[in-house]
Amino acid sequence: MLRRAQCLLRLHGNGGHSLVSRFRNYATDEGNPKQNPNPNPRAQKPGTKNLPALRNPFAAAQDRTKNSYLTMVEIFQERDVHRRNHVEFIYAALKNMADFGVERDLEVYKALINVMPKGKFIPTNMFQAEFMHYPKQQQCIIDLLEQMEDCGVMPDHEMEAMLLNVFGRQGHPLRKYWRMMYWMPKFKNLSPWPLPDPVPDDTLEMAKLALERMCTVDLRSKITVFETSELKDAIDDTWIVSGMSPEQEKLLREHSRQKALYIEGPFHIWLRNRRINYFTLRADADSEFLSELDERQLDEDDVSHIEVPFFGRAPPRRHNQLGKLRSVHQQDDGTIMAICATGTSTKDSLLSWIRLLEANGNPSIGEVPVLFRFTSEVPAKAEEIEGGASVPATSDNSSQDEHISSRQK
C-alpha cells in the first residue's frame, strides 16, 4: 500500500514526503493522540524490549502451608502447554520455602524439578555437553540441589530419573546429584551422637540430649533432672538438667574452701537447628598439681600427634604408668566441676542448682564461695558499639560477678 502511494505521489509531484509520513504514522498508530494517548518513550527507542511483568504468587499467599505451596506449583504447570519463565518461578519458589516451612521436604524439591520440560535441554553432542547446554536452566537446578545440600535433604533415586529426563546423562545437574549421593550418605550417620529426625520440640528433652552429648567425655557421668519446686525458697518454677560424674564429685570434695567456684555462661550448643544454653561450674586451674605432672605423659584425648604403630615402627612408649595423672576435667584453664541447663537460664535457677547439688551428695559446696560470671551477648554488644555509645574497657573479670555465700541460704 505504501509503495503504491509513493508511485502516485511521484506522478503528482509535491507533497510526497508529508503524505508518506502520514501513511507511516497511520500504519504504526503514531502521531495520533486519540489512538495512542500515552505513548511509551522507552518503546520508541531502538534495541529496547517490553518485557512482561512477573508476579510472585508465593509472596502474596495467605495460607502458608505445604499444600498451598504444592498447589501453586501445580497451577503453574497446568497454566499453559507452552510454559515460560521456568527459571524465574523456581528461584521465587526457592526463596520463599522457609516462609512455608518446606525447606527440608524432599517432595517439594521434586515438584520444582518437575516444572522443567522434559527432553528439551538434553545435549545432543559433546560440545553442548561440555559447554553447558542451556546454562541458565542448568544453573537453576544446580542451585536447587545446593539448597537441598545446605538444608541436609538427601535426594533419592527418583530424583535421579527426573534429572535424567530433563538434562540427560551428560547434564551438569546430574553430575551434581552424583556428587551429593557419594558424600551425603557418608556424612549422614557419621556423628557418634545420633539425633532423632526431626528433633523434639520439648526444651527439656533437647537439654537432656545436649548434656548427654557433652558428658560422654566421662562415661561414668550421670544426668539428673531436678525441679526447683523441691526447694522452699526457690523463685523460678522450672526444671534443671545437671550433669556430673563421680570424678567431678571427688574433685569438688578435694577443692580448697578458700578458693571460689564460678558459674559461667551461657554457652551454646547446637543440635541441628536448635540452640541450647548451658552453664558450667568451674574452678581455677590447680597450678601446683599441674606443675607436678610428668611432661612426657601422653594425653589420650589429644589427636594432634597420632602415631601409627605399623610399617616396622615400634609402638609409642607410654609414661602414664607411674606418677600423678590428671583427670579429663582438669584442663589448663580450669577444672570443670559440673554442667547444667535450666528452663529459664536465670540467676535464680542457677542458685537453685547449687542448692540442689548441695542437697544431693555434695555438702562441701556449701562451704565454698560461688561467683556468677555471666558473659555478655554478642548482638547486644555489637549494637552498642555500632550505635556510637562508649563501651568501657574490660578485663577478664568484666563479666558480672556476684558473690553468694552458701551459708546464708
UniProtKB/Swiss-Prot annotation:
- Coiled coil located at which positions? none
Task: Return the annotated region ranges for Disordered.
Answer: 27-53, 383-409
* GO BP term, pick one: innate immune response
Location comes to: Cytoplasm; Nucleus; Mitochondrion
All disulfide bonds of the chain are none
Locate the transmembrane regions by residue number.
none
Query: InterPro entries recorded for this chain?
Result: ECIST_C (IPR029342), ECSIT (IPR010418), ECSIT_N (IPR046448)
By its UniProt entry, which SMART domains does this protein fall under?
Answer: ECSIT_Cterm
Which keywords fit this entry according to its UniProt record?
Cytoplasm, Immunity, Innate immunity, Mitochondrion, Nucleus, Transit peptide
Transit peptide, residue positions per record: 1-26
Gene Ontology, cellular component aspect? cytoplasm; mitochondrion; nucleus
Give the Pfam families listed for this entry. Answer: ECSIT_C, ECSIT_N
Compositional bias per record (Basic and acidic residues), positions renumbered to this chain: 400-409
Subunit composition and interactions:
Interacts with Traf6. Associates with mitochondrial complex I assembly intermediates during its biogenesis.
What is the role of this chain? As part of the MCIA complex, involved in the assembly of the mitochondrial complex I. Involved in the innate immune response; promotes the production of antibacterial peptides.
Family the entry assigns: Belongs to the ECSIT family.
User: Mind telling me what this protein is named?
Assistant: Evolutionarily conserved signaling intermediate in Toll pathway, mitochondrial
Q: Tell me the organism.
A: Drosophila melanogaster
